[in-house]
Amino acid sequence: MAQGIEHLPSRSRVLDQDRFEDNIKAAENLLGSFGKLMRPHVKTHRTPELARLQLGGRARGVTCATVGELEAMAAAGIDDLLLANEIVSPDKLERIAAVAATSRVLVAVDSMRGAQLLSAAAVRAGSNIEVLIDVDVGLNRCGVRSAPEAVALARMVLEAPGLILAGLMGYEGRLRAAVADRVQKFDAGCESLEQVKSALETEGIKVGIVSGAGTSTFNEGLRSPVLTEIQAGTYAMMEADLDGLDLPFKRACTVIATVISVTSDGAVLDAGRKSIGCENGLPEALLPGASVLKINEEHTLLSCHRPVALGTRVMLFPSKVPTTFNLHDRVWLIRGNVVERSVPITARGRSD
C-alpha cells in the first residue's frame, strides 16, 4: 500500500520523480535541437537505477568520477562508461581493464606515463580501453597544456597496444553562477579544445568525441561548435546556486527534517551536515517565512518570521547534490506526496 511522505523518517533523502523525469525530457529536447549527445555524470547520485532512467535517446552512456562508480554502474548492466579522471594506481588500472573486458570503457589520459600504464593493464587483461585526451580548459587541474603536447600523446596512444584513441575531453567545473565572465571563460576553454582538435586533424589524427561542459555550463555547451557531448549530472536534480542560470531544470531532491526545538524567533531541525551537502553554501528551508542561519553536524538553525510548532516537517534543498547522496544509503522516490519506493544508492562510498 502506498504511503504518504509524512510517514518517511526524518533525515530521509527524497527525489520527486515527476520533476526528475521532466528534467531528463527537457535535456533531451535541447540536446536534439542542437545536435548534441549527453553522457550523464553519475557522481551526482551514485545510483545505477537512476542512471538507467537517464539513458536513452541522446544519452548514450554515463560519466564516472571513480573506479568504484565505474564498477558499480557496470555491475548494474550499464556498458558504456567514461571515467573522467586520470588513473595511475596499479590496482585501479587492473580493475578498469577488467571492466573493459565486458563493457565499453573510456578513460581520461593526460600523460605519456599514464597512457603506458593503462596500455599495460589492458594487455594483461586482454581488453581494449578507449582514451580521451584530457585538455586543461582553465580549471588548472588535470589535462595537457598545449596542442603539441596533445599531438605527441595522441601518437603514443595510437601506437599503444590495448588502447584506442576516441577523442578529447575538457572540463571546467568552477564556472558556477557567481563567477564573473563565466561565458567568456567557458568559450576560452572551448577554444583550447578547438586548437587541440585542429592540431590533431592537421596531423591526420581523427577526433571523434569531444566531451565537456556540465550543468552550470549546459546552455554554453549546447552552443559550442567543438563539443559533441555534455557531461552534466546535476541537471536532473539541480542545486540552489544554479537557479540564476536560465536553465529549464527543476528542483527535484530534498532532505526531510523535523523541528525538534523552538526559540522566540526560530527553530532547530534534526538534520545537519551529516545529512545534507553544504559545499556551495547553506541549504534552503522550504518553509514560508523561514531561512537557514547555521548548520552543524546534526542540526540546522532557522530564523522564522512566524511561530513554528514542534514536530513540523521541513524540506531542505541542498546546495550540493553529490555529497548529499553520498551521505545516504537509499533515496525515496515520490510522486506528489505519495511514496512509491526506495532505491539503494549502490555506489555510496565508492570513492575507491
Language model regions located:
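Generic N-terminal amphipathic, Lys/Arg-enriched alpha-helix
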Residues: M1-L15
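Conserved, mostly hydrophobic/aromatic
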Residues: F20, K43, M73, I133, ...
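Flexible, glycine/charged-enriched surface loops at secondary-structure junctions
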Residues: K36-L37, T202-I209, F325-H328
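Active-site-proximal beta-alpha core segment in soluble small-molecule metabolic enzymes
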Residues: H41-G170, L175-R176
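Active-site loop/helix belt of alpha/beta enzymes
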Residues: E130, D136-L247
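Active-site loop ensemble at the mouth of alpha/beta enzyme cores that anchors a bound cofactor
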Residues: S216-P288
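C-terminal accessory subdomain/extension
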Residues: V262-D352
